[in-house]
A protein has these predicted regions:
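A cross-family "folded-core" feature that marks the main globular domain of proteins
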Residues: 1-117
């Protein structure tokens, strides 16, 4: 019973994470006004980043380089969307994200923007 409960909990967390990531993709598509090509390299990079971002949040691991100021200055629209997504994701996964995650997420969002244009 205990093993089953632990397994069920992991499945629940995985489903919750997948749902949260899908909501984030929807937010990006709404912001760009275009669907994201799920076969693109930018999409795959974004998905991998989000998966590891959630994993880092659950373990407390932090990124070494802060890109927030640069991304905010150079790509304010992508940074705004990244900020909104990070807030949404924190609520969905029940963990706080380190503030440096916003800049890295903005970088991936900007790549998706570039592909969507």
């Amino acid at each position: 019973h205990i093993h089953s409960a632990i397994g069920d909990e992991k499945v629940s967390v995985a489903m919750q994470t997948a749902r949260a990531v899908r909501e984030c993709i929807d937010m990006i598509e709404k912001a760009t006004g275009k669907p994201i090509d799920v076969l693109s390299l930018s999409y795959n990079r974004l998905m991998n980043h989000m998966k590891y971002m959630v994993a880092r949040a659950s373990t407390g691991e932090k990124l070494n380089l802060d890109m927030n100021e640069y991304m905010l200055d150079q790509y304010p629209q992508a940074y705004k969307v990244a900020t909104d997504i990070c807030k949404n994701l924190e609520g969905c996964i029940g963990h706080n994200l380190d503030e440096t995650e916003t800049g890295y997420l903005a970088m991936h969002i900007q790549r998706v923007y570039k592909d969507a244009v």
